[in-house]
Amino acid sequence: ATKFIQMLTPRDLSKLSVGQCKYVLIVNNDGGILNDPVLLRLKENHYWLSLADSDILLWAQGVAINSGLNVKIIEPDVSPLQLQGPNSGKIMEALFGESINDLKYYWLRELDLDGIPLIVSRTGWSSELGYELYLRDGSMGDKLWEKIMAAGKPHGLKPGHTSSIRRIEGGMLSYHADADINTNPYELNLGRLVNLDTDINFIGKDALQKINQDGIKRKQVGVILDCDPLTGPNTTFWEILKDNEVVGKITSAVYSPRLKQNIALAMVSINNSE
């Protein structure tokens, strides 16, 4: 399983310990990004990929068939739930006790909450303190929800959804918006997740070596939009023009109440990236 997982990602996993998580990229043979999941190592030969907004099951199964490795690939019956925000630590302490405060960033722990089996990781799709709870028994979903909401009530916990504001402020990607199969890691300033100077073998290594050597033609940047406050996130790409020529596109944009301005992620030609 370890050898197979390493085939999927250009990030060196040789020092990934049991109980540890890593943010990784999965790329195709051309170096294009297929997904940017969080990898969780539950046991010596047991891994989870907590995926972004694209499927990777058929890709992984196809790679496995042609790898000759003895691996089993399934979609686990788990229901991920995120608890994010400045008070998430206090709520987790109310649920699990003070020991939860020892859980390090990007590590996981197998826990039982009054008979509810969970994998808890200190990860999340926000730039705040946060946790992800993976429910391992779907029949206990209602019970888990009620317990979390009860513990969170004194701290103002409310149901929510993915926060475009917080993730754009933190420069976090949204697959299909900020990245897709035609985007490579270097265009997203994610070269740190590509370890070319190692002996590891992974899909797309030759292509990424060439891209790294030749350089990129476009690059993701953060921008401020000087206009009236946006009423919501963009739902289409917005062209960026310079001298009436298209030099890029806005991929994610939103108004930030904290920063009191419109902020965005954009993909622009390398000559216009400064």
Language-model region placement:
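Conserved, structured C-terminal
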Residues: 40-274
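Internal amphipathic helical hairpin motif
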Residues: 2-33, 88-116
